[in-house]
Regions:
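Short, conserved acidic/polar surface loops in the N-terminal third of protein domains
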Residues: 51-52, 91-96, 134-136
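Short coil/turn segments at secondary-structure boundaries
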Residues: 53-60, 97-102, 128
């Protein structure tokens, strides 16, 4: 039976992750080519930002920043799409999480701030934590001429990491080079029972980093 590392070794490993995290750099907008870039917003909807069982102050805190970044993208002709939880009453996900973001309710709608930042956002509904598994999303990305993807939103250790890793893996599978960028300041996780948000978020970012995702502090 394999045993977990002893505490001192774990703390040594964690120190390395912490130092990496605190050394994150800021990406300059000039380093992004607008015509080949797609901004993907994950779950910045009322049910995670403003109301409902899974709304949280952590996600609310990035709402305006993502709205501002979305407006910046529009000004640079960078296309933005959004993924939004749209569950049915019999969603099996409710065996893990409280009932949330039912299709057709205000919880599944983008926040007003983000909707107002760009009136041309295409919204894709999703019924799981991995939006890339929705056929319409994967097909849209595959048929686009984009090879740089900036992912913002929530939750970093759930929907964001799953989407980012699956996107990267799909491009790798097809031998198509791509750049996947996740800005820390434009992502957040939430507080749930038996969930340590700061640790979960940091480790999610580190796992993405070790799998070829570009983690930056912000894009300024």
């Amino acid at each position: 039976m394999k045993h977990i590392k002893n505490f001192d070794l774990l703390m040594s490993d964690f120190k390395g992750v912490y130092e990496w995290f605190n050394g994150l750099s800021t990406l300059r907008p000039d380093d992004i080519k607008p015509d080949s870039t797609l901004h993907i917003i994950v779950d910045m909807i009322n049910g995670f930002v403003k109301e409902g069982a899974l709304s949280s102050c952590e996600v609310f805190s990035i709402n305006n920043s993502i709205a501002q970044f979305t407006k910046f993208c529009e000004s640079k002709n960078i296309q933005t799409i959004a993924l939004a939880d749209e569950h049915t009453n019999d969603s099996t996900e409710f065996s893990t999480y409280p009932v949330h973001c039912l299709k057709g309710t205000s919880e599944s709608a983008l926040t007003d701030e983000i909707k107002n930042a760009d009136e041309n956002i295409t919204v894709f509904g999703k019924n799981s934590t991995n939006g890339y598994l929705e056929p319409a999303v994967a097909e849209f990305i595959k048929n686009s001429d984009k090879n740089t993807f900036i992912i913002t939103g929530d939750c970093t250790d759930m929907c964001v990491i799953q989407f980012a890793l699956t996107l990267k893996a799909d491009f790798n599978r097809r031998n198509v080079p791509c750049r996947v960028i996740v800005p820390y300041d434009l992502t957040a996780t939430c507080s749930l029972p038996n969930h340590e948000p700061e640790l979960a978020e940091m480790m999610a970012l580190y796992i993405m980093h070790t799998n070829g995702i570009e983690i930056v502090k912000n894009i300024l």
